[in-house]
Structures are given as structure tokens and as C-alpha cells.
Swiss-Prot record:
Keywords: Amino-acid biosynthesis, Aromatic amino acid biosynthesis, FAD, Flavoprotein, FMN, Lyase, NADP. SUPFAM superfamilies: Chorismate synthase, AroC. GO terms for cellular component: cytosol. This reaction introduces a second double bond into the aromatic ring system. It comes from the Bacteria. The gene is aroC. It comes from Bacteroides thetaiotaomicron (strain ATCC 29148 / DSM 2079 / JCM 5827 / CCUG 10774 / NCTC 10582 / VPI-5482 / E50). Its EC number is 4.2.3.5. FMN binds at R124, S125, S126, N240, A241, G284, K299, P300, I301, A302, T303, R325. InterPro entries: Chorismate_synth (IPR000453), Chorismate_synth_AroC_sf (IPR035904), Chorismate_synthase_CS (IPR020541). The lineage of its organism: Bacteria, Pseudomonadati, Bacteroidota, Bacteroidia, Bacteroidales. Reduced FMN (FMNH(2)). This is Chorismate synthase.
């Protein structure tokens, strides 16, 4: 029931970390869209494990195989089915997790809720599930590209190291020039050094991703319970390890007066615009035509390669030192996931908007 995301553009995902594969079925994708499978694969490659010394060493090709809904390079309007086969599972690395619960992981809650859990890499709770989101998000990006809408995310903070400027202060073309996916080369090196240091200690660290959506038309959003920022927040907080979401000035707005926070309108050659964009491109839950920007906070990954106190499945106190291949920081690989969830949300709400008037 809750393995599906979206209203009109709708993804249903399936698969587990150490199962045979991860895939999905997409309903509501418009017909006639040229499907650039190379682009879809490039998006998956940005999420793929083993892409740098900062990420998990698990080696997966993550080659997407489309099963339906595409004919002669174009979408047919029928459900698009796809799968990515798992090829490099090391399930024995998780044998020591079968009888114990990892602190702050989904192990305990899954077991209590369902009475059973897949301890191999976390099963369905693994971030490997996000493969399906990246594929669907890549297709959504292809559709949005025809509408002049672009979505870009980047790492803006790792631990205490953060970018002080806004997205407009940086050359976003530099994001893919470093392993951290940060548009500031100097800060990127500091962030990478910190992640590498933490990884060497067997620990993990969190941080923040910033995302900006450009070219979004006025009018996307469905008040009162379908506000665009609420939909984006729901999308982002469904991502593994995501802990907080803010858009526009967010919490910074607490320190501002209304006269400072308000985005004053003006007439720009017949087009109504605002001098500022503290609202983050959304007013009253509806896009106003300005850039939409938001931030997503990710916690440190729960699986540590150092000893921690925990309990076993019988409730007896014990200790755990995880084995296996794990990321020390989720942020570099989460960039395409955040973009994908944003793309799916915007396309879905664009299609929803077409139902409001005859």
C-alpha cells in the first residue's frame, strides 16, 4: 500500500538489498516522450556504490533493464516496468546482525511491526531501494526538460563544514567535479577529508543537501492538503536517513521581521516578479514562478564499523561491531536521489494542475 509514490505520475517500487533485484512500475507517464536510456543510466551511476573512496566499496553495475512502456525510443503511455539486478551481495557479512539490533536502524522497528526482518543489508529498509526512485526520477527529468524545468542538488554541509552562501553564489557546474558533489572546490576538499577521517575511525557523519528547481511554472500545488512544499517535504523525508526539511529561508526566517521576510512584487516588463525570494518560490502552497529551493538534513548512517552497545532479539544486553561494506556519509550518493524525488513531485503536480480547469 505504501510502496507507491505519486498521484498521477506514480511509482511503485519493489526489491531488497540482498534480493534478486530492485525495480519498479511507473504509471501515468506521458506518451511520446523520447527516452534517453543513456541519461537514465548516468543518473544511476551517480547513485551507484563504489564510485569513490568516500563511498561503500560494494561493486554493482546497476544496469537498468526496461521491461515495458517504451517502444522505438519513446514512451507509449502504458506502465513502464524496469529492474536492476543485484550482482554483488555479500550476505555472510551480515550473519552477526541476525540476532541483534543495530542502534538507530530500522532493524528493531521492522521486527516488531512485521514479526520478521531481512537482516541482510537491511532488506527493504536499505537505501538500495532508492534505485527505483532514481530511475523514475530520471524519466521525470526527461519530461520536465521539455517544459524547461531543471533540478540541481548539491552537498552544502558535512558535519560542521558548511557553505555560507546560497545556491546563486556558486557555479553549480562544478558539482560533479569532486567526489563530495559540492560546488565550492575548497570546501569540497575539507568535506572529503572529514568523511575520509571519520571512515577511518569506523564512524559515520551526516550533513545537508541543497536543491534548487528552476523554470517551474506558476500554479503548481493543491491547497489545502496538497501544498507543493508539503509534497516536497513528504518526498524528501521518505528518503533513508533524511531527518529534516526546510524550504525558502526556513528556520532563518525566525530572525527576520515581516517587513524583511516579505517578497515585494514588481512589474518586470509585464511579468509580475519579486525583488527577493525568501518564500523559496512557493506562496500559499502554490509555486509562484520563482526558483524553488530547499534543504534536506541527513543523519549519520546508523551502521558503524566500531563497537556499540545494543540488545539481542531476546532483549539481553550485548555489543555489536558491524561488518560488511558501508558508506561513511550518505550525502554524495544522496544528491541524485534528492533530485529524483523532486523531479517526480514536480512532474506529478504539473500533471495534477492540468486537471483543475477544463
Amino acid at each position: 500500500m505504501f510502496n507507491s509514490f505519486g498521484n498521477i505520475f506514480r511509482l511503485t517500487s519493489f526489491g531488497e538489498s540482498h534480493g534478486k533485484g530492485v525495480g519498479g512500475v511507473i504509471d501515468g507517464f506521458p506518451s511520446g516522450i523520447t527516452i534517453d536510456e543513456e541519461f537514465v543510466q548516468q543518473e544511476l551511476n551517480r547513485r551507484r556504490p563504489g564510485q569513490s573512496i568516500l563511498t561503500t566499496p560494494r561493486k554493482e553495475a546497476d544496469k537498468v533493464e526496461f521491461l515495458s512502456g517504451i517502444f522505438e525510443g519513446k514512451s507509449t503511455g502504458c506502465p513502464i516496468g524496469f529492474i536492476v539486478w543485484n550482482e554483488n551481495q555479500h550476505s555472510n557479512d551480515y550473519n552477526n546482525l541476525k540476532e541483534v539490533y543495530r542502534p538507530s536502524h530500522a532493524d528493531y522497528t521492522y521486527k516488531v511491526k512485521y514479526g520478521i526482518r531481512d537482516h541482510r543489508g537491511g532488506g527493504r529498509s536499505s537505501a538500495r531501494e532508492t534505485i527505483s526512485r532514481v530511475v523514475a526520477g530520471a524519466l521525470a527529468k526527461l519530461a520536465l526538460r521539455q517544459l524547461g524545468i531543471s533540478i540541481t542538488a548539491y552537498t552544502s554541509q558535512v558535519g560542521a563544514i558548511k557553505l555560507e552562501g546560497t545556491y546563486s553564489d556558486y557555479d553549480l557546474d562544478l558539482i560533479e567535479t569532486n567526489d563530495v558533489r559540492c560546488p565550492d572546490p575548497e570546501k569540497a576538499k575539507e568535506m572529503a577529508d572529514l568523511i575520509y577521517k571519520v571512515k577511518g575511525e569506523g564512524d559515520t557523519i551526516g550533513g545537508t543537501l541543497t536543491c534548487v528547481i528552476k523554470g517551474c511554472p506558476i500554479g503548481l500545488g493543491q491547497p489545502v492538503f496538497g501544498k507543493l512544499h508539503a509534497a516536497l517535504g513528504n518526498a524528501m523525508l521518505s528518503i533513508n536517513a533524511a531527518k529534516a526539511f526546510e524550504y525558502g529561508e526556513g528556520f532563518k526566517g525566525l530572525k527576520m521581521k515581516g517587513s524583511e521576510q516579505n517578497d515585494v512584487f514588481f512589474n518586470n516588463n509585464g511579468r509580475i516578479e519579486t525583488h527577493t525570494n525568501h518564500s523559496g518560490g512557493i506562496q500559499g502552497g502554490i509555486s509562484n514562478g520563482q526558483d524553488i529551493y530547499f534543504r534536506v538534513v541527513f543523519k549519520p548512517i546508523a551502521t558503524l564499523l566500531m563497537e556499540q552497545e545494543t540488545v539481542n532479539i531476546d532483549g539481553v544486553d550485548t555489543t555489536l561491531k558491524a561488518r560488511g561494506r558501508h558508506d561513511a556519509c550518505v550525502l554524495p550518493r544522496a544528491v541524485p536521489i534528492v533530485e529524483a524525488m523532486a523531479a517526480m513531485t514536480i512532474l506529478d503536480y504539473y500533471l495534477l494542475d492540468k486537471t483543475t480547469q477544463l
